[in-house]
Amino acid sequence: MKKTVILSVIDGLGLREEKQGNAFKLAKTPNFDKLFNEYPNSVIQASGDYVGLPDDQMGNSEVGHLNIGAGQIVYTGLSLINKDIKDNKFKQNAKFIAAFNAVKKNNETNTLHLMGLLSDGGVHSHEEHLFKLIEAAHENGLKNVSVHVFGDGRDVAPRSILTSIKKLEAITKKYNYAIGSIMGRFYAMDRDQIFTRNEQALEVMMGKTTNYFTNASEYIKAQYQKDISDEFFIPAINKDYLAKKLNLKDNDAVIFYNFRPDRARQLSHLLIQSNLYNYQSKNQVKLSNFTSMMKYEGLDTNIAYEEMKITNPLGNILAKNGLSQLRIAETQKYAHVTFFFDGGNDVLYENEERILIDSVKADSFADYPEMSAAGITDTLIANLGKYDVIILNYANPDMVGHTGNLKATIKALEFLDFQYGKILKAIEKTNHTLFITADHGNAEITEDENGNPATKHTTSPVMLIVTDKNLKLNSGTLANIAPTILDYLKIPKPKNMLDSLIMNNKRTSK
């Protein structure tokens, strides 16, 4: 009988023995217990140099799906940029120099705006890249540089930005530059097409606000006193900076230093007035230069760093071998099972279909821990037997885990466990084999050792479970999963892919 494969990627669920703050261990998960006890499984590394990130760097959804789909270790923005910094090439990047030169055409009145997530989390950005850009701007003779700070509090601790702000205050003071505005990523980095949030961020950068600060650190402390954490800082502008007319205006230049694109695209769309979305901003500015750290898919920007090219990911190999495939995800992770899974390529393969399940629009997914998992499961079950390979993503462990709400994350995992129970029942006595993995850790550390919320990703390994009892699996990395699936389907893997994790000497055919 012809084998068919379901690859289910759980977003943000690592493996960890300790129970403290571990939503996975604390949740009641009879179906996961059955999967681990009755089926072949192994441990998969999903962080650091195992997935093309710096040593000990936590994994993330983009990198995870890139590695799973590529079948090889993908060196991503953070690694590429850090290498250039180490090799003293970063400041000589031609796209940065072009942005500097655009400002210097009228150095007295034009301003360079550096915007992005101020964090050492390394998921969307890294603060070291910002500091090097500031140094480079000074070395190139720029008079006016403004930094627009996006608070993180999600990929790092919820109230951790003051350490980074102190560094930024020191370097901007050294070169007589400014912290122009402060806002939470909730506003500046929305990706759910809630453009009112992006508009609020843009209006503040343009000076269209009466919410002021004069000292960045003091403003942040005041936000904390109102129980507002880094992610949700109310957008505010530096009053002194506004008085000097250094707000975002025509003929200024922007370098958006986030290297991860998904949460940078909407704000960038507003800034360059692209055609990517139907929404057009009422707040328009004519920039002399807009440079993005990496490619922001669908936007015409000056790209400082090109991503590693993945030309033959799993989806392409399946298509070339005549197999049909279906991708299923909700809005929050749809790009991950399509664009990122396909190596950063926006392509629809022959015999490929995609189904998008709408995410709940919510200020906090802790209020909706189930998210759209049930819709994903129902869609999967309705399409069994119609495709050779089905690839899907469950978003709720990651998105709810990011809230740091342990009880809600437990609920998310118990609901996810119920989904796997439904899937196991549906594929019983069929030729479908379920591969379950995760892209990175998160939900297994939802509280720190002091009981405080933990909202960031982790360096924990993840699972690989295969519902074929005839197999035995080696341990490996996320990049081993695609060749394992190809091996299982008896399709030769490309030379650039890593090895299959199936122990051939233990395997018997059905």
UniProtKB/Swiss-Prot annotation:
Q: Which Gene3D superfamilies match?
A: Alkaline Phosphatase, subunit A, BPG-independent phosphoglycerate mutase, domain B
Under the GO molecular function aspect, what terms does this record hold? Answer: manganese ion binding; phosphoglycerate mutase activity
Look up the EC number in the record and give it: 5.4.2.12
| Cellular component aspect of the GO annotation | cytosol
Binding residue positions for Mn(2+) 2: D11, S61, D439, H440
Catalyses: (2R)-2-phosphoglycerate = (2R)-3-phosphoglycerate
Q: Per UniProt, where does Mn(2+) 1 bind?
A: D398, H402, H457
Q: In which pathway does it act?
A: Carbohydrate degradation; glycolysis; pyruvate from D-glyceraldehyde 3-phosphate: step 3/5
Active site at S61 (phosphoserine intermediate)
UniProt keywords, alphabetically: Glycolysis, Isomerase, Manganese, Metal-binding
Cofactors that this protein relies on: Mn(2+)
Gene Ontology terms: biological process: glucose catabolic process; glycolytic process
Write down how the cofactor binds this protein: Binds 2 manganese ions per subunit.
List the PANTHER family.
2,3-BISPHOSPHOGLYCERATE-INDEPENDENT PHOSPHOGLYCERATE MUTASE (PTHR31637:SF0)
* Entries under NCBIfam families matching the protein: pgm_bpd_ind (TIGR01307)
Its subunit composition reads: Monomer.
Question: What job does this protein perform?
Answer: Catalyzes the interconversion of 2-phosphoglycerate and 3-phosphoglycerate.
Return the similarity comment. Belongs to the BPG-independent phosphoglycerate mutase family.
Full protein name:
2,3-bisphosphoglycerate-independent phosphoglycerate mutase
Originating organism: Mycoplasma mobile (strain ATCC 43663 / 163K / NCTC 11711) (Mesomycoplasma mobile)
What gene name is listed for this protein?
Answer: gpmI
